Amino acid sequence: MDIKAEEICAIIEQQIENFDREIEISEMGTIISVGDGIARIHGLNRAMAGELLEFPGDVIGMVLNLEEDNVGAAILGDTHHIKEGDSVRRTGRIVEVPVGEALIGRVVNGIGQPIDGGGALEGAEARQVEIKAPGIVTRKSVHQPVQTGLKAIDALVPIGRGQRELIIGDRQTGKTALAIDAIINQKGQDMVCIYVAIGQKQSTVAQVVDKLKQHGAMDYTIVVSAGASEPAPLQFIAPYAGVTMGEYFRDNGRHALIVYDDLSKHAVAYRQLSLLLRRPPGREAFPGDVFYLHSRLLERAAKLNDELGGGSLTALPIIETQAGDLSSYIPTNVISITDGQIFLEADLFYSGVRPAINVGLSVSRVGGSAQVKAMKQVAGTLRLSLAQYREMAAFAQFGSDLDAATQKQLARGARLVEILKQPQYQPLPVEKQILVIYAANNGYVDDYPLTVLRRYEEELYSFLEHRHGDLLKDLAEKKAIDTDLEARIKAVLAAFGEQFTP
């Protein structure tokens, strides 16, 4: 076989030209201590705050402390097999989670990995978890309503798209139930819902998911769960992962609703993390930046202006109080960050007023401008009437001989309280709420005993659906009560009153 020197030269030249010397440079560090979900690593001098690190066994971590001779990192996963002396690699990426349509209907953990056995997330894109909230110029004032389907909220503490409304109360007062009802009521409202469970029992989260499935709400809901058995770093990151998923829809001109259940446990997880990282403790042993922890999370809920698509992200954070104490550290922080609060009271809950909303202490600072005009018309005097009723009821305990006007006001107030009660998982469309509140406010139920008002309400809805569907339709379309519509409402309520037997 005859090989020519020219051919050999040509082959060598070609190989030299095509030679691509790829060198993968990665910065490695060594674990000097590990425990309680925290690792201290030596040798990562160029690590960034919030950067992802790769630990042995495909576990990821997040840089939280940058110190002179080491970095403190939170391990976002199982720590049992990670030991002192192991190597850790920088990724050069800030913590990211998957976002997009692929997440709807799924249950994921605090870093967006599916935990519902439904397979991998197809077609999801990654987004950084820690990003800046929209500024003032990019926002628009809240003007569209979020209907929760609960009479007491939609009438007295209305919520608008882009608002942050705190749900606060002791344990077992119906905080989660209220948020779940709000999610169920978003069916057909073009709203994506995100439920973030922080430090909850896995059995409780499974019950919530089951309830959402029963009511067809998982078709538009994402559940992010960082359970009580998960390490503190995962509980800390979960709300940020949830809000990042919500921002994807907000930034694409859609509307999203996010529930954080609850931020008290989130603050406790962050306190644990901070103390393990040896950050100096402050009031109640919380670190100094615990206010910023929640403010930077809740400021990301916003109503964007029309140039940016007009999307919105509405937040319903939940806070658990101890014995009704609103003045402790975390409750006061979150009250000052949010645009209003719904205060649930244990005494009301146990006396049968459910949802157990204390109307006097609950307020919506920006929701009034988003409330449906018809609801504003019928519920305008409702708060005042309930306040007067409570004052008179307290006064009437001391005296038995009350004049007729006082007795009438007490009777009306008791009926208003009764009408605002509502069973769980039965949210109502706003037009039905308007009609029943109109009936109670204008004396149509004054002559009935309190015990029959629940039946009155149910039969009224049935009567309206079967005989006066056009009235409900007109109310839903017009969203305001004019003279003609009011005359029709009066006629319908009078006709129903004639056939109703207490």
Swiss-Prot record:
Membrane topology designation: Peripheral membrane protein
Site description Required for activity, residues in chain: 362
GO molecular function, one term: ATP binding
GO cellular component: plasma membrane; proton-transporting ATP synthase complex
Keyword Flavoprotein belongs to the record: no
Subcellular location: Cell inner membrane
Source species, domain of life: Bacteria
Protein name in UniProt: ATP synthase subunit alpha 1/3
Organismal lineage: Bacteria, Pseudomonadati, Thermodesulfobacteriota, Desulfuromonadia, Desulfuromonadales
Gene: atpA1
